């Protein structure tokens, strides 16, 4: 068996004392409490010493009690003045007693028989009695002397005075303490008798040890790489933020161009009208979207684009008959927090794009909803589109499946037919979560020609809008979407880094 310097030192002192408290070992070895306790744990694990724990009720001085040790009990201070003057009023004692002490002093002096109390013109007057002249040490005075040296067991102090009396006068307080007594075992004594060489241990070989040759006189402490150590939590990025950054980088590596915007506010023109969504569509009502109270309206883009969108709604484009109603520019000017990131896709298409071209954006969107494990009223959406001559619906399904499996880590994926005013055909993407079952990720489709032609695009455009928060739930292994924005330090510290 191998013992370190501290273990050897404690064992040698135990051999001298046979048994001792931890406090006594601290005093004898000049080690601190932590070092002694660690040494004892090692000695006990190797059967060289035994540690016995005993719970005791202990009494120790309060701050008031410590003050009385320094300046004396109130009655002792009052008695000293009485012995000097023979007779005093309560006012004469104000310099040596506090107001609270003055209230109690008459009763204490009368109880001890140290003073005679009478009423005079000057107020209550105290006169030194014969018993006061010969006053001796009382139990409380002896108890204070004992406690001044340190805490004492209740049993020990009860031999002198009632603990209840000390607590009543707020001189002392009671606490339960664990007393550790240590004894050396026969195995420990046997090892000491064989002889223990006490050498200083070092953990670092310094230049000084080499130059002076002192390395020969010391013992090098081996490193235990399996020993438990305190966990260190270095600075770390928020897990969901890392997930978003990884997706952004992955898409850029795949050749996608990122669409950016500075504002969270859109006109209804970009949020709905440019997407060929009619102005009487129920999704445009207050139950499905937020509206801005002030300012209420924004500005429409250039007249040519507005007239094309108007024509698409009223009479149709690309062989369509449109929606057959009178389109209102006033309605299109209304401002709202962005309801979906597809509004940015419409803006990008109207600006002009590379063909073939791939575009994406990750944006915050807002929709009225009931907060639960899978729904938020403010969330992130990844929106994107690909424009090219030869694109088909199967290309879109392939991209969506890749998103679900490679990015979210989903094992099962399903597609369902769906409807959106601005795509045809349309599809819903869902994936299976082990805790929540089938979870909808988002919608997708091929942009309708009525929309793309109005925006100046003549080729097929496949597009998608996916709730990226739900993708993150799969990847980060959480079953409540609200947890992605949690302040829970345990989760933030222990969440694993992702791909």
UniProtKB/Swiss-Prot annotation:
Residues where Mg(2+) binds: 424
Cofactor note: Binds 2 magnesium ions per tetramer.
One Gene Ontology molecular-function label: magnesium ion binding
UniProt superkingdom: Archaea
UniProt-listed Gene3D superfamilies: Bira Bifunctional Protein, Domain 2, Winged helix-like DNA-binding domain superfamily/Winged helix DNA-binding domain
Record-listed L-phenylalanine binding positions: 342, 381-383, 422, 447
Keywords: Aminoacyl-tRNA synthetase, ATP-binding, Cytoplasm, Ligase, Magnesium, Metal-binding, Nucleotide-binding, Protein biosynthesis
Pfam families the UniProt entry points to: tRNA-synt_2d
Enzyme Commission code: 6.1.1.20
GO cellular component: cytoplasm
Cofactor section: Mg(2+)
EC top class, as a word: ligase
Compartment annotation: Cytoplasm
Gene Ontology annotations of biological process type: phenylalanyl-tRNA aminoacylation
InterPro entries: aa-tRNA-synth_II, aa-tRNA-synth_II/BPL/LPL, Phe-tRNA-synth_IIc_asu, Phe_tRNA_ligase_alpha_bac/arc, Phenylalanyl-tRNA_Synthase, WH-like_DNA-bd_sf, WH_DNA-bd_sf
Catalyses which reaction(s): tRNA(Phe) + L-phenylalanine + ATP = L-phenylalanyl-tRNA(Phe) + AMP + diphosphate + H(+)
Family statement drawn from the similarity comment of this UniProt entry: Belongs to the class-II aminoacyl-tRNA synthetase family. Phe-tRNA synthetase alpha subunit type 2 subfamily.
Complex formation: Tetramer of two alpha and two beta subunits.
Protein name per Swiss-Prot or TrEMBL: Phenylalanine--tRNA ligase alpha subunit
């Amino acid at each position: 068996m191998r013992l370190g310097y501290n273990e050897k030192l404690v064992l040698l002192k135990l051999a001298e004392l046979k048994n001792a408290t931890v406090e006594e070992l601290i005093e004898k070895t000049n080690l601190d409490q932590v070092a002694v306790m660690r040494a004892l744990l090692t000695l006990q694990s190797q059967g060289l010493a035994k540690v016995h724990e005993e719970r005791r009720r202990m009494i120790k001085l309060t701050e008031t009690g410590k003050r009385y040790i320094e300046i004396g009990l109130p009655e002792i201070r009052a008695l000293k003045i009485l012995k000097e003057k023979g007779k005093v009023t309560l006012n004469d004692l104000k310099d040596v007693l506090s107001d609270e002490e003055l209230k109690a002093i008459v009763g204490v002096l009368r109880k001890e028989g140290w003073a005679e109390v009478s009423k005079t013109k000057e107020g209550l007057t105290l006169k030194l009695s014969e018993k006061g002249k010969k006053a001796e040490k009382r139990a409380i005075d002896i108890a204070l002397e004992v406690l001044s040296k340190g805490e004492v067991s209740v049993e020990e102090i009860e031999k002198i005075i009632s603990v209840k009396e000390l607590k009543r006068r707020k001189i002392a307080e009671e606490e339960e303490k664990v007393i550790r007594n240590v004894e050396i075992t026969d195995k420990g004594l046997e090892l000491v008798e064989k002889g223990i060489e006490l050498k200083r241990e070092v953990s670092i070989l310094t230049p000084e040890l080499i130059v002076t040759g002192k390395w020969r006189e010391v013992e090098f402490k081996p490193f235990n790489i399996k020993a438990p150590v305190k966990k260190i939590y270095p600075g770390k990025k928020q897990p969901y933020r890392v997930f978003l950054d990884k997706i952004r980088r992955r898409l850029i590596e795949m050749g996608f161009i990122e669409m950016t915007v500075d504002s969270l506010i859109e006109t209804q023109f970009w949020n709905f009208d440019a997407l060929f969504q009619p102005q009487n569509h129920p999704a445009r009502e207050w139950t499905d979207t937020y509206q801005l109270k002030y300012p209420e309206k924004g500005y429409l883009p250039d007249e040519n684009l507005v007239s094309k969108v108007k024509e698409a709604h009223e009479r149709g484009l690309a062989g369509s008959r449109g929606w057959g109603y009178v389109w209102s520019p006033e309605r299109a000017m209304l401002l709202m927090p962005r309801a979906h990131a597809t509004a940015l896709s419409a803006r990008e298409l109207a600006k002009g794009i590379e063909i073939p071209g791939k575009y994406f954006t990750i944006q915050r969107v807002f929709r009225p909803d009931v907060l639960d494990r899978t729904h938020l009223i403010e969330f992130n959406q990844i929106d994107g589109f690909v424009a090219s001559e030869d694109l088909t619906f199967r290309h879109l399904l392939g991209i969506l499946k890749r998103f679900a499996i490679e990015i979210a880590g989903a094992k099962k994926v399903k597609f369902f037919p769906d409807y959106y005013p601005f795509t045809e055909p349309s599809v819903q993407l869902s994936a299976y979560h082990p805790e929540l079952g089938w979870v909808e990720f988002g919608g997708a489709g091929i942009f309708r020609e009525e929309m793309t032609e109005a925006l100046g695009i003549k080729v097929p455009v496949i597009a998608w809008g996916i709730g990226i928060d739900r993708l993150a739930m799969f990847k980060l292994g959480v079953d409540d979407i609200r947890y992605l924005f949690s302040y829970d330090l345990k989760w933030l510290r222990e969440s694993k880094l992702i791909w």
